UniProtKB/Swiss-Prot annotation:
Localisation per UniProt entry: Cytoplasm
Gene it is expressed from: prs
Molecular function terms from GO: ATP binding; kinase activity; magnesium ion binding; ribose phosphate diphosphokinase activity
Enzyme class of the recorded protein, top EC level: transferase
Record-listed Mg(2+) 1 binding positions: H137
Catalytic activity reported: D-ribose 5-phosphate + ATP = 5-phospho-alpha-D-ribose 1-diphosphate + AMP + H(+)
Binding positions (Mg(2+) 2): D177
An annotated GO cellular component: cytoplasm
UniProt xrefs under SMART domains: Pribosyltran_N
InterPro entries reported for this sequence: PRib_PP_synth_CS (IPR000842), Pribosyltran_N (IPR029099), PRibTrfase_dom (IPR000836), PRTase-like (IPR029057), Rib-P_diPkinase (IPR005946), Rib-P_diPkinase_bac (IPR037515)
UniProt cross-references to PROSITE patterns, sorted A to Z: PRPP_SYNTHASE
Binding-site residues, ATP: D43, G44, E45, R102, Q103
Protein's name according to its UniProt entry: Ribose-phosphate pyrophosphokinase
One of the GO biological process terms: 5-phosphoribose 1-diphosphate biosynthetic process
Length: 322
C-alpha cells in the first residue's frame, strides 16, 4: 500500500529549535524525518548538510523562530537554501511560532524597525515557496511575506480541551486586554455562546499602579483567559488576581505560544492562576515542565493534517476557519 511519502514525494526536515514536535508530525503523517546535519562550526556559524537526495521532492521544514530567535531564524534560512540548491520541487517553511511577530508596527512613529517584516522578507527572499504558521500575533503579518501564508488556528485543539476539562456550565471566557477581544469572542461563540468578559487595564497617571477594571460579571464563575502568547506572564498573573478579587471561583488560561521568558515560571507558580494550558509550538524549559500549573497540548496532529492537505492540493481554510 503506497504511503503519503510514496504518493506525493513528501519529505519533512527539522531544525534544532523543536525536533520533538517534528518527530510527532512525522509520526502522524507516517513518514520518517529527513536526514540532515544541522550544527555549528567552532566559530558559531551555521553548518547544514542535507544527507539524502531531495531532488524533485516536496519538502517541509519545521522550525519555530523562538529564543534564541536570531539563531533559529538563521538556521531556518540556511536549511531552506541548502534544500533549494539540492533541486527540491518546493519548500514550505513550517514555523509553528513566528518570532519577532510583536514587532509589527512603529508605535507612535518611533525610530524603530518593523522586524516582523524584516524576518518575513528574509524567508521570502531565500526561496521559501510558502509558509505555514500557527496563530500569528496579528493576521496582517501575512502581508509582509511575498509568498502564500497559511495561518492556521490552534483554537480547535484548545476548545476541545476546555470542553473536556471544564465543560461550559458556569464558564466565562475572558480577554486579558482590549486587543484580544476578537479572539476571545470567537472562542466564546464556539463554546455555545458562553459569556464574555474583558479586562481593561488603565494607568490613571504617571507613577500610579495600573488599575484593572473587569467588564463583565465573573462572580462565582470559572474564568478562561485566552491569548496567543504568554511571555513573562506578568499581565496574566495580574489578571488572575483581579478576577479572583471580583469573585471568580477558578481562573485558567489557554494560550497557544509558551514564550515563558525571564521570571515567567516563578510568576506562574506564585500566582492566583489555577492552570495554564499551552501548546508545543515552542518547547518548554525544564522549569516549565516541572511546574504543576502548566500543562502542554500538542499541535502535531493539526500541523500534520495541514501539511497533508497542502501536499494533496486540498483546502486548508475549510478546515481551520476561525
Amino acid at each position: 500500500m503506497p504511503t503519503i511519502q510514496d504518493e506525493r514525494n513528501l519529505m519533512v526536515f527539522s531544525g534544532n529549535a523543536n525536533k520533538p514536535l517534528t518527530q510527532s508530525i512525522c509520526k502522524e503523517l507516517g513518514v520518517r524525518m529527513g536526514k540532515s546535519l544541522v550544527s555549528r562550526f567552532s566559530d558559531g556559524e551555521e553548518q547544514v548538510e542535507i544527507e539524502e537526495s531531495v531532488r524533485r521532492q516536496e519538502v517541509f521544514v519545521v522550525q519555530p523562530t523562538c529564543a534564541p530567535s536570531a539563531e533559529n531564524l538563521m538556521e531556518l534560512l540556511v536549511i531552506i537554501d541548502a534544500l533549494k540548491r539540492a533541486s527540491v520541487s518546493s519548500v514550505t517553511a513550517v514555523i509553528p511560532y513566528f518570532g519577532y511577530s510583536r514587532q509589527d508596527r512603529r508605535m507612535r512613529s518611533l525610530r524603530v524597525p518593523i522586524t516582523a517584516k524584516v524576518a518575513a522578507k528574509m524567508i521570502s527572499a531565500i526561496g521559501a515557496d510558502r509558509v505555514l504558521t500557527i496563530d500569528l500575533h496579528a493576521d496582517q503579518i501575512q502581508g509582509f511575506f511575498d509568498v502564500p501564508v497559511d495561518n492556521v488556528y490552534a483554537s480547535p485543539l484548545l476548545l476541545a480541551d476546555i470542553w473536556r476539562a471544564y465543560g461550559t456550565d458556569n464558564l466565562i471566557v475572558v480577554s486579558p486586554d482590549v486587543g484580544g477581544v476578537v479572539r476571545a469572542r470567537a472562542m466564546a461563540k464556539r463554546l455555545g455562546d458562553t459569556d464574555l468578559a474583558i479586562i481593561d487595564k488603565r494607568r490613571p497617571r504617571a507613577n500610579v499602579a495600573t488599575v484593572m477594571n473587569i467588564i463583565g460579571e465573573v462572580n462565582g464563575k470559572t474564568c478562561v483567559l485566552v491569548d496567543d502568547l504568554v511571555d513573562t506572564a506578568g499581565t496574566l498573573c495580574a489578571a488572575a488576581v483581579a478576577l479572583k478579587q471580583n469573585g471568580a471561583t477558578k481562573v485558567v488560561a489557554y494560550i497557544t505560544h509558551p514564550v515563558l521568558s525571564g521570571p515567567a515560571v516563578d510568576n506562574i507558580n506564585n500566582s492566583e492562576l489555577d492552570e495554564l494550558v499551552v501548546t508545543d509550538t515552542i518547547p518548554l524549559s525544564d522549569a516549565a515542565r516541572e511546574c504543576r500549573k502548566i500543562r502542554q497540548l500538542s499541535v502535531a496532529e493539526l500541523l500534520a493534517e495541514t501539511i497533508r492537505r497542502i501536499a494533496f492540493g486540498e483546502s486548508v481554510s475549510s478546515l481551520y476557519v476561525d
